[in-house]
């Protein structure tokens, strides 16, 4: 049964669909009808109605939040199923989210460590080096002088992921039932794949184990260096890794 909170969120999704005139995406579902009603009652809210479908879809997913952005990123890789112009637009989606406050990161790290940060780190930068939908990264220096980066899960991210996945699954079932092209895209399977990806991202110990295995696989390789994990300070919610300086892979000029 759909709860009131979910109904309110679905209404918000319908509003975004109306904003970008994407009502037809959900075909004959009640959500599409609600989006058309919103577009009719508040036509001034419609944006980018002359833009190509792919661009409107990208902007809508961006508005709907980080979990929907990840769904769009995953869809962009399905070039065997999506038209090239839509796949190209979705590939432009970036997992960019404003960082949460440094004091919250400190609290999360201390909770995981079971001791004050000052007992483990001689330095801990409150300003995040990078921030994404599931976690963010802080620079730090261990008490022994080693430079490290500390990855911290966002407060409450587990509950938010569960809520959004429930909604996305509802939408996938709607699309699967009413959209004639659903058999090619297989939306329910796609959401299950997204859920698996997010489940892995919510467990930093699993990520650390994968990184350690990768390091073992490339031991002695002169072309690739994988940073070391500091297992004494790595938990499900917090991961500490050797800091390595380099050039971003997308910096072609460098």
Model segments located where?
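Glycine-rich ATP phosphate-binding loop
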Residues: 139, 146-154
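Well-ordered beta-strand positions
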Residues: 128-130, 141, 230-232
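ATP-dependent phospho-/nucleotidyl transfer catalytic cores
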Residues: 91-98, 110, 158-163, 173-254
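Short beta-strand elements
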Residues: 138-142, 242-245
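N-terminal accessory/targeting segments that precede structured cores
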Residues: 1-136, 144, 160-187
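Residues located in well-ordered beta-strands
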Residues: 136, 151, 225-228
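Residue-level signature of catalytic and energy-coupling elements of molecular machines
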Residues: 72, 137, 150, 207, ...
């Amino acid at each position: 049964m759909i709860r009131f909170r979910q109904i309110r969120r679905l209404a918000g999704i319908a509003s975004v669909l109306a904003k970008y005139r994407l009502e037809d995406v959900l075909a004959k579902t009640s959500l599409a009808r609600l989006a058309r009603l919103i577009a009719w009652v508040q036509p001034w809210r419609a944006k980018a109605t002359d833009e190509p479908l792919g661009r409107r879809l990208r902007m809508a997913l961006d508005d709907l939040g980080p979990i929907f952005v990840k769904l769009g990123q995953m869809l962009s890789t399905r070039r065997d199923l999506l038209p090239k112009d839509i796949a190209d637009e979705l590939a432009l989606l970036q997992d960019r989210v404003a960082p949460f406050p440094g004091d919250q990161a400190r609290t999360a790290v201390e909770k995981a460590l079971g001791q004050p940060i000052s007992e483990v780190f001689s330095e801990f930068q409150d300003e995040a080096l990078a921030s994404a939908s599931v976690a963010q990264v802080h620079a730090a220096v261990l008490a022994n002088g080693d430079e490290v980066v500390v990855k911290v899960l966002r407060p409450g991210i587990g509950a938010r992921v569960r809520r959004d996945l429930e909604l996305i699954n509802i939408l996938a079932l709607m699309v699967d039932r009413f959209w004639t092209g659903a058999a090619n895209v297989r939306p329910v399977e796609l959401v299950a794949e997204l859920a698996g990806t997010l489940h892995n991202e919510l467990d930093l110990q699993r990520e650390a184990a994968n990184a350690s295995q990768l390091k073992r696989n490339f031991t002695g390789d002169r072309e690739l260096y994988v940073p070391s994990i500091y297992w004494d300070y790595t938990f499900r919610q917090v991961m500490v890794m050797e800091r390595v300086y380099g050039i971003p892979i997308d910096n072609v000029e460098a």
